[in-house]
Amino acid sequence: MDSDTPPLIVDIDGTLTDESRALDPHVIPVLREWPARVVIATGKAMPFPIALCEFLGLDRTVVAENGGVVFVEATDELRLEGDHEAALAVGESYRDLGHDLGFGQIDLANRWRETELVVSLDQPLEPLEELAAARGLVVLDTGFAYHVTDPVVDKGTGLEAVCSELDLDPAEFLAVGDSVNDAQMFDLAGEAVAVANADETALERADRVTDASYGDGFLEAVAPYRD
């Protein structure tokens, strides 16, 4: 790789995975060998990207819960932003209306969340949006779940937090993603690439769109820096 390889911020689901959400094994050596900083940015709770970094041998630099949680191992900094109590209250009100979060009794999707709440896509959206708006929150449809989240945080604010810790500029970054929740980090990054399976918002905000989808799209996105 060239010494000018930029730092990388990358989504997980739909970007590093295949269509079944399994990690594409071909992305592993790329991430492990990337000579600049790698930031994993996801809507998932913090244990998921932390585990990914751990098993890939990467420094644990993560943006989780769509920017609500930021951890930078190099500076031992953990930042939590967002109104978790309001998000939990939305969930309680939603259940009071007879709806369900949709992830079963144990609910691994929400178990470790610290700033937001997620609801399965097979649950009704309109009442969730109404309850969220009443508490000053928004609902993001990432294509994998409905995220009840604070509008003051996103992956862009997460990237800014990482950069403030590491003395980097967001404009130095290559960003790769597939969803509406990647849009703000796309806006800040020096180059933003959407994989072909991305939603309309991500496609519109990207500087470049790959021909390939999912993990293959990620490989195409980073190929100019590996040739």
Curated annotation (Swiss-Prot):
The active site is at 11 (nucleophile). Mg(2+) binds at residues 11, 13, 178, 182. The keyword Hydrolase applies. It catalyses: 2-phosphoglycolate + H2O = glycolate + phosphate. Substrate binds at residue 155. SUPFAM superfamilies: HAD-like. The keyword Magnesium applies. Its cofactor is Mg(2+). Keywords: Carbohydrate metabolism, Hydrolase, Magnesium, Metal-binding. One of its GO terms (molecular function) is phosphoglycolate phosphatase activity. One of its GO terms (cellular component) is cytosol. Its EC number is 3.1.3.18. Belongs to the archaeal SPP-like hydrolase family. Catalyzes the dephosphorylation of 2-phosphoglycolate. This is Phosphoglycolate phosphatase. It comes from Haloarcula marismortui (strain ATCC 43049 / DSM 3752 / JCM 8966 / VKM B-1809) (Halobacterium marismortui).
